[in-house]
Amino acid sequence: MSDNRLFTSVETLNLSSPVLEKLKLSGINTLEDFNTFTLEELRLLLQEAFLEVLPILKNFALPRNLQNLDLSEAVINILTELGMEDFQDLLQTKMAVLTKSFETNPLAFQKLNDLFKLYNHFPSISSDKEYGSRDYDYFKIRLAAPEEIRQWSYGEVTSYETINYRTYKPEISGLFCQKIFGPVVDFQCACSKKQVSIKSQFCNKCGVEFTETKVRRERMGHIELQTPIVHTWYLNSSPSRLAILLNIKTKQLEEIVYYVSYVVIDPGKTEFKPKEIITETQYSEALYEFGNTFVALTGAEAVKKLLENLNLEKTIKVLRKSLSENSKQKRESIIKRLEIIESFHQSDNKPEWMVMDVIPVLPPGLRPMVPLDGGRFATTEVNDLYRRILNRNNRLKKQMLQKAPRLIIKNEKRMLQEAVDALFDNTKTSKKNVNNVEKNRPLKSLSEMLRGKQGRFRQNLLGKRVDYSGRSVIIVGPDLEMHQCGVPREMAIILFKPFILKKLQETKGIDKKNANTIYEKMNEEVWNALEEVVKEHPVLLNRAPTLHRLGIQAFDPKLIDGKAIRLHPLVTPAFNADFDGDQMAIYVPLSLEAQAEARLLMLVSNNILDPKNGNPVVTPSQDMVLGNYYLTIEEKKDRTINSYDSAQRTAEHQFKHRNEGTFFADINEAKTAYQNKEIHLHTRIFIKPQTINLSFTEEQRQKYLMTTLGKLIFNDILPPSFPYINEPTQFNLDVKTPDAYFLPPGTNPKQFLKKLPTPKPFNKKFLSMIIACFFKQMKITETSKMLDHIKNLGFKYSTIAGITVSFADINTYSNKQELLQEVETRNIQIETWHKDGFLTDAERRRLVINEWKTIRDEIQEGLMKEFKQDNHIFMMSESGARGSVSNFTQLAGMRGLMNNPKGEIIEVPVKASFREGLKVSEFFISTHGARKGSTDTALKTAESGYLTRRLVDVTQDIVVIKEDCNSDRGFIVEAMMSDGKEIVSLKKRIMGRFASCDICHPKTNTLIVARNELIIESKAQEIITAKIKKVPIRSILTCNCEYGICAKDYGVNLATNKLVEIGEAVGVIAAQSIGEPGTQLTMRTFHTGGVASASDITQGLPRIEELFEVRKPKGKALISELKGKIKKIDKIRSQNPEIVITEENDPDTEHRYILEPNVDILVSKNNIVYPGQKLTSGSVDLKELLRVAGTTEVQKYILEEVQKVYRAQNVYISDKHIEIIIHQMFKQILIIDEGDTHLLPGTEITINKFKKANLKMLEEKKRLAVGRPIILGITRSSLRSDSLLSAASFQETTKILIDAAIKGKTDHLYGLKENVIIGGLIPAGTGILETTLFKYPKEPATTSELTKKTNQN
């Protein structure tokens, strides 16, 4: 502000006449005159007028001199050191700077704060944030004090008016007032004066500040309520926090708040007791009899008085004392009350702040009002709620001034209470909701703006739309390299606009404006600039739904014509994409950091392995498989063809392979012969191994190799370290080419070929094995090149093969009718037995169904034998390109048994195949299954998506934060079995993990793996060879880290096959790995058969949910509660069966278990049973197992059960992902005895808090607290998160915010969600370097410094 502004006359200011008169009398004629007085002198001179002058003093920073502000010498010295010359400098300083400078002198800082309060000035807290900086350490939430609400406010809203319908300008003192909230147009006041870009000046006439219009998104107002109002969150939410705090029943408290009853504050001469609740009638009678000698209040006023009278410290002491004396039921209610009272006592909240005298008004930018055509307005519903409050508040004010009757005022107060309730939460009000007139539904309150998928958290904070993005349909790009994608020029020209403009400015030496003009013309220069810009600039492609991290990957863009994005065919499995109209979104990383991350971490060619199990995710499919299958077929010349035109086709075949057994010098000679049609791709030929650049033994090099040209072409893409692949076997791949294919010199080739068996062609499974083997030996970049070669070969030779499907390819099975006749006869026999009473209906049904199943299998086997090797449909199935044996049986054999809508098998089968055609009745039977399939898929997708969301939420804060937590415990693993079959091998379970103790050979005692050594594949094989059945490994379940986990407990990162790095977000990866295959799981709960009492066995997705949510299982198994011996099993017909177990230590003590009738008993007499062992079939109740057998057994059980469900669908997920989820289910502990800690018995707290409390007691040599572990379902675990932001954005938003506000909770921002919400870098990946957990030195530290640090650690 220029100094000449200080010579403005006070008469031009917007001041009342009495104030102007006082200023004149004090000798203050201009603003400069204020500088001649101190603050205290001004206060004494102006008296009550001082408050009216204060805003002017603040706006012009008066008095200027720091000495005139009544600050102590110490404060002035600190401010001078900071380089502040006057009051204006002080007002422009950020709070962060002041806080730091006054750290050592809190009393001086208090003085400065008092000055700010007087001037209603609150310095800016946030400093200018740079990219990725973290200048905040935590996020705190608490109740707002009335003074704070007034301090946030820029003025009181007194009128319910919004916008003038004629001028479209905001009304003065209304909900959109420019004086309170700031100007509607940048630097323009309400009377349309303009001021150019100088802030902090006010219009003399209308009082609006000249500033940017964006302040309307941050400036708040307030409404001064004529009567106190209770905040509905603390009254109407269940359980009512206010009711618990005041120890009043919720219903009674509601009656007080809504002016139905009165509460006695001071009984005076009456017979009432303090805090007694009386009715309106009782109050009127007492008032009539005793007059004003007693005090009884109603409404929020009464609640406020009760809260103010609460002595928290005293109440805590009384309650703690009564804890030990009362019954269990009373103790629970005392603990609930204690929790709330202690929350208030330990935080800087006051209970009376739950009753409001003033409410804040949201900035108008967040509740806009837009004029529509025809003079109507579209408005946010919050505005209607505010208008209702203002209407009722103003009416109440008027009635109070007019001294209206008590009844009328009471009714108006109740209506005001309801209006404020509706503003904060319009769903909870016990009274009638405030409805939208047009749509007849409750208006959207502030709580609704936060809740649910459309709420602020999930819609705007966790998922934002981003610029520089586009979307288009995808088509195949067979000519692309692995790391490329085709981007349409039309898209790229817009997406890369800023880079093109920069390029134009650099090359042509022009300014921004001219560059824009050239860009608009879209001439040759612009397109050339685009070609330059796109080079080496990766883009991200994403396909919804993004089920796992491979759903968004980086590619190098290649500009193409047309309008569709082109995608490399090999990356489709990772995106689960196909080319039937799928769309993909494209994003451009802008900053250099983002581009580097995209290239190094997200490029497709670096993401070849699936994070869930470490298998290659980019395996060739369909045409690529078919082409390679066709290429590697080997045919004998002397084969006879039996089908149609057999003579002609046999002759053609023999002519094609007429030169079988020919010797060639090298591959080029063989190719020339093929081009001249002397040999075929499948003809068996001989070649010298020396001419092939692959691995052979010395002995093999002296002989001739028998192979085909097709196989020579295929082997040409393999590196020299590989053996020549001549047959699809593990031996050929891992060891060498079998010697059987080598012809010793001097041997008759014709005789040699006759004896030699024909190897199978290379199918999809074998191609995957080659890729996995290649990946182990080579770098990622080499693998991606090799994959491109496989793709090119596949497409080329599937085109050359010209494989088609025709009607003639489907041959019906010759023996079908005889087989059907046999079954019909047998079924008639079964029917006869049933009629004669030898079979029950259920048994008859089972036998009939089994007969049809057997016959279908027989037809299937026969069909496969009749199918010829060169049948195109057979080739598709055999190669793994498309279709399965079952599909062909339905095409050419018989469709078989179908299910009805309930999922039960229909007895009558579909006898026809699709080749023969179905009857109407058969077609009808088939429709049930098809319809059920579609509905199941739709339900499954939603269910699976919700499961993934819960899993991500429960694990999102699990990040690898250190190398080693030095845990001395381990987790013992063994091969996983189900029904006697091995479902996960021991080798798979231990590979890539660390040993928790030394593992020695059981016979020789030689060390195989040392403690804390990584078990690599060769070591795992040694362990298996040594016949070790149980291996102790480091596990996430035994990790000692306070937050996150350590690298040693996690092991190898399956996506890279290297040790996991610090900062890896392993929690999210685990959740995605379990959730992503969720759609492949079944939705069924299977019936065990016709037995009425047999329980349903839950499988598939419902079973996973049952385990992770810790629900009581259907068909619960009975478990043993002790270690002992089974004495007897009684199966008495009239009663339920009974198992008797004797204790191991005390054989005389017997435990009896009564069973349900018809259950399968899994144990027999004299068996030894252990705690937690299943006695009957079914699923175990996890809470029961935890009580009986302890944590480790439950963790092991969950791990095995989850694996069983996924393995049943042939999905393999690494144990470590499931372990992370289980780790999160066991993060809380139930306090049994509090010892000398501040913990409350019966409460559930995190293990970290429990450990800290006990460590403190150990230091002070006091009694420790005792607790027992509890198991939480993933939803409950998410809601109990230490982070209030993470929990609130998940579910039950208001409930979590209510509790967090009462406790004055602090969120230390350890997880990912919290940081995304407040717009910071996540503490994972490259962002972990910025967090408070990791302080890396800016400059390289000297060796002496590093040694010093290590010693300190």
Swiss-Prot record:
Swiss-Prot/TrEMBL cofactor(s): Mg(2+); Zn(2+)
Presence of keyword Nucleus: no
Binding site for Mg(2+): D578, D580, D582
Region (DNA-directed RNA polymerase subunit beta'): 118-1353
Catalytic activity: RNA(n) + a ribonucleoside 5'-triphosphate = RNA(n+1) + diphosphate
Pfam families, per the entry: RNA_pol_Rpb1_1, RNA_pol_Rpb1_2, RNA_pol_Rpb1_3, RNA_pol_Rpb1_4, RNA_pol_Rpb1_5
GO biological processes: DNA-templated transcription
E.C. number: 2.7.7.6
Keyword Metal-binding: yes
Stretch list, region Unknown: 1-117
Binding locations of Zn(2+): C189, C191, C203, C206
Cofactor comment text: Binds 1 Mg(2+) ion per subunit. Binds 1 Zn(2+) ion per subunit; 2 are expected compared to other organisms.
Keywords: DNA-directed RNA polymerase, Magnesium, Metal-binding, Nucleotidyltransferase, Transcription, Transferase, Zinc
Gene3D superfamilies: 1.10.132.30, 1.10.150.390, 1.10.1790.20, 1.10.40.90, 2.40.40.20, 2.40.50.100, RNA polymerase II, clamp domain, RNA polymerase Rpb1, domain 3
GO molecular function: DNA binding; DNA-directed RNA polymerase activity; magnesium ion binding; zinc ion binding
Any one annotated GO CC term: DNA-directed RNA polymerase complex
HAMAP family assigned to the protein according to its UniProt record, in alphabetical order: RNApol_bact_RpoC
Job of this protein: DNA-dependent RNA polymerase catalyzes the transcription of DNA into RNA using the four ribonucleoside triphosphates as substrates.
Assembly with partners or alone: The RNAP catalytic core consists of 2 alpha, 1 beta, 1 beta' and 1 omega subunit. When a sigma factor is associated with the core the holoenzyme is formed, which can initiate transcription.
Family that this chain belongs to: Belongs to the RNA polymerase beta' chain family.
Stated name of the protein: DNA-directed RNA polymerase subunit beta'
Organism: Aster yellows witches'-broom phytoplasma (strain AYWB)
